[in-house]
Amino acid sequence: MLQALKESKDFLQLTLAQPQHFDETFTFMLGSHTQVEVWDTGVIVFEPKVARGKDIVLSCAVHGNETAPIELCNGLIKSLLEERLIAEQRVLFLFGNPPAIINGTRFIDENLNRLFNGAHSVGEGLVNPERIRAKKLEFYVDKFFSSSKDNSHKIHYDLHTAIRGSKHEKFAIYPYRPGRKYSGEQIMFLEACGIDTVLFHHEPTTTFSYFSSLNYQADAFTIELGKVLPMGQNDMTRFIALNEMLSRLIGNKSLELPDFNAKTVNLYQVCRAINKGFDDFEFTFANDVENFTSFPKGYILAKEGGENIKVEHEVEAIVFPNAKVPVGQRTVLCLKPASTENIDG
């Protein structure tokens, strides 16, 4: 495996050749400047000889059919392996669900991004590949962050693409973080990446980004980069700014970020999540309605169990509507304009 990776510089290819697990870990040097550690299938770490104070996790393929982030991350890994990009920050790359990548599906048995923060072991326990993988991914993130310096700046960008179109093509979800202000610098970094819309979540979740935010106080985000497309059909020119900014971050180059300015970004507060209570749950709007479509107060968003579910605020926008989830899971997030008072500018 080591020789194959050294020759191809293609970590995704190596991962998909053995999607379940690697039988052995291996380590090698890039020149005299970076140690590369492969911990498992889809798990590779770059440890610079002299790190500059940031510990960066870049995860993708938590949903296997969300291909643009996979291509983006594999390109960054290849640049590092070819030494066109030299890491001056510690960085961990994760391909979340390799079997689902091969399958071209969101998941095999269960939505991996509902299984973090210990959810993998609740109820039935470790009964399917996604639950087992979620526990392993938590372990790898813990291993990475726990081996850093105490005062390091921990960052986790969990990269996705969305099922449906969106009025804001690229957007980020900032996990719930009570008692901690949101980072204006991080919001401006995202804006420089071409991600000009941020949602502030209102409650704990079982997502990968919330896991890192809660347990390691990382600046963590779930980042949506447009619409799901098959592998090889993504227009990667749409991610030039993101690729450039991530390369600068990894290489410890100047980010040249302006001060926080709310006028340059779209900020939303999640005001509620609507969970499915009955099998007959259905939305009243068309299946092709875009993310961030707004509805006025009193509008009937959905019906279930003989009851109407209505818009509660003057205006609410919606994201991630999905009526086909199992009973008990989230069908949609409702949003209102966000205040800037809890942002550290």
Curated annotation (Swiss-Prot):
Pathway: Amino-acid degradation; L-arginine degradation via AST pathway; L-glutamate and succinate from L-arginine: step 5/5. GO terms for biological process: arginine catabolic process to glutamate; arginine catabolic process to succinate. InterPro entries: AspA/AstE_fam, AstE_AspA_cat, Aste_AspA_hybrid_dom, SuccinylGlu_desuccinylase. GO terms for molecular function: hydrolase activity, acting on ester bonds; succinylglutamate desuccinylase activity; zinc ion binding. Binds 1 zinc ion per subunit. Zn(2+) binds at residues 63, 66, 160. It comes from the Bacteria. Its cofactor is Zn(2+). Keywords: Arginine metabolism, Hydrolase, Metal-binding, Zinc. It catalyses: N-succinyl-L-glutamate + H2O = L-glutamate + succinate. Its EC number is 3.5.1.96. The active site is at residue 224. Pfam families: AstE_AspA_cat, AstE_AspA_hybrid. HAMAP family: Arg_catab_AstE. Belongs to the AspA/AstE family. Succinylglutamate desuccinylase subfamily. Transforms N(2)-succinylglutamate into succinate and glutamate. This is Succinylglutamate desuccinylase. It comes from Shewanella woodyi (strain ATCC 51908 / MS32).
